[in-house]
Amino acid sequence: MATLRVSLSLWNLHAGSRGAGRVYFRARARPRPGDLFQPLPGVCGAGTPCRGLCSEAESGSPKIKKPTFMDEEVQSILIKMTGLDLLKIFKPAVQETKPPTYKLMTQAQLEEATRQAIEAAKVRLKMPPVLEERTPINDVLAEDKILEGTETGKYVFTDISYSIPHRERFIVVREPSGTLRKASWEERDRMIQIYFPKEGRRVLTPVIFREENLQTMYSQDRHVDVLNLCVAQFEPDSADYIKVHHQTYEDIDKYGKYDLLRSTRHFGGMAWYFVNKKKIDGLLIDQIQRDLVDDAASLVQLYHILHPDGQSAQEAKEQAAEGLQLIKVFAKTEAQKGAYIELTLQAYQEAFISSSAAS
């Protein structure tokens, strides 16, 4: 059985330890049956996280299960609101300059090429998952005081068997104090990236995610770039992933830059976040001002799905409200900027009437 031992003086895996210290990595095969190690909590099937943003009610509870991000109805509404702007989805990327390619096509060939482009666009618009933050790992397996002081650095033992899903992979840390514990999520992510490198991900968090650098990116309207880098670097249920996404959404809401995420894979997650926070007023006004009234109605519909006991949902149900009427019900009941929404709706209706009369 091959073993790997590496000394690393600049990387301190344990945030609470004093000094830089040293860390040793050791890779081993699967532990013997009967060992103390147990699979990590919060996984299902082949190790895929199964926690949604809105978790199910506890077993045996009479509470009705709340909708989750991956529910079919929710996904259908979010996909509809996201939009399908092919020019934006396939906008030129920064790369080596090459001469453009021109093709002469028949009408049938053009229609087929357009169909293929739409299918490729739908793949690019597949939304990243939205999960609850993972539970911290604080499991201590043994306290071997006899080993205290024998080493000055930590040992990290990793099961590198290829057949094991990463979520179920055994990774433990031996502290200089003699404590044997399960590795924290951050330690696990780093070790897995060392042994099983993922394209676009670094072992250490890139400096772009520092607060001052994020603010610079936001000021340049590069919110999509931030979110794309975040998806590549972090696990979807990690604290950093959730923090960066929420911070980006809040900046977009603060300055009304919702259109930056429209026709991108991140629009659905943003809409879901605002609906959960009951902060859809800004996005709703933006949709109406851009003549996306159907999307605005879908946003209110999603709001009612997530908050069925609210006054808006109850009145809309009683009135069987749809379309503009659905938006008006929300504006009069639960909207934080109800008067502004009503004025925006009025301006939209007047413009629509004028346009109809002119034609």
Swiss-Prot record:
Subcellular location per UniProt equals: Mitochondrion
Provenance organism: Bos taurus (Bovine)
Task: Please give the family membership noted in the entry.
Answer: Belongs to the mitochondrion-specific ribosomal protein mS22 family.
GO cellular-component term (any): mitochondrial small ribosomal subunit
Listed A to Z, the keywords are: Mitochondrion, Ribonucleoprotein, Ribosomal protein
**Quaternary structure note:** Component of the mitochondrial ribosome small subunit (28S) which comprises a 12S rRNA and about 30 distinct proteins.
Q: Which domain of life is it from?
A: Eukaryota
One Pfam family named in its UniProt record = MRP-S22
Return one GO MF term.
structural constituent of ribosome
Q: Does the keyword Ribonucleoprotein apply?
A: yes
Report the InterPro entries cross-referenced here.
Ribosomal_mS22
What start-end ranges are recorded for coiled-coil regions in this protein?
A: none
Q: What is the lineage of its organism?
A: Eukaryota, Metazoa, Chordata, Craniata, Vertebrata
The protein's name is Small ribosomal subunit protein mS22
Q: One biological-process term from Gene Ontology?
A: mitochondrial translation
